[in-house]
Regions:
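Walker A (P-loop) ATP-phosphate-binding motif of ABC ATPase nucleotide-binding domains
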Residues: 2
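Hydrophobic anchor at the beta1->P-loop junction of P-loop NTPases
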Residues: 5
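The conserved Walker
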Residues: 9
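Conserved lysine of the Walker
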Residues: 13
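Hydrophobic positions on the alpha1 helix immediately C-terminal to the Walker A/P-loop
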Residues: 16, 20
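N-terminal phosphate/diphosphate-binding loop that engages ATP/GTP or pyrophosphate donors
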Residues: 21-72, 76
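Phosphate-binding/switch loop-helix module in NTP-utilizing enzymes
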Residues: 69-120
């Protein structure tokens, strides 16, 4: 099963993915993959890191000072996706019960290897929970095992409960 979480910027996609990760780990499931938290400097968003959930390794994904392909005001470090994110996701495919990818968006998709790896995950049998940029969602092929949830501040708790119920049915967790 693939659970894709989308919504407007600031709607709580990453928070939702984090809550679901905590829930699964609390149930004894192993979780791997990546998160891409923002980096703030002086109260302003300066960039984004990519963090390997299993090892804790981190690298700078994008910043206002990074050279590389641009997404808005951020330069993207494609190399960190290829060298840190892709191996983390591939390792999680082999070793973990669930893969987390936060997020599948324009910055991350600048890496051809990342795009290939996401396609592999989508074609695999492993459980995936991913935050997906709204515009990216259309490019992800529709599959029977993909469930899309739209998060907004008013419905966050209801959406979370619907996903927990779905996970319980899927994995017999209840």
């Amino acid at each position: 099963m693939k659970i894709l979480i989308t919504g407007r910027p600031g709607s709580g996609k990453s928070t939702m993915v984090g809550r679901l990760r905590d829930y699964l780990e609390g149930m004894g499931f192993s979780v791997g993959g990546i998160i891409t938290p923002e980096v703030r400097v002086g109260g302003s968003r300066w960039g984004f890191e990519v963090v390997d959930i299993a090892s804790g390794r981190r690298g700078l994904l994008a910043s206002v000072e990074t050279e590389g392909p641009r997404i808005g005001r951020y330069g993207v470090n494609v190399g960190v996706m290829d060298e840190l994110a892709v191996p983390a996701i591939r390792r999680a495919m082999l070793e973990d019960d669930c893969i987390i990818i936060d997020e599948i968006g324009p910055m991350e998709l600048k890496s051809r290897e990342f795009r290939r790896t996401v396609d592999e995950v989508l074609s695999s049998d492993v459980l995936l929970i991913a935050a997906v940029h709204r515009k990216t969602l259309q490019s992800i092929k529709k599959r029977e095992d993909i469930r899309v949830f739209v998060v907004d501040p008013e419905k966050r708790d209801r959406v979370y409960q619907r996903i927990i119920d779905l996970l319980g049915d899927y994995h017999g967790m209840r």
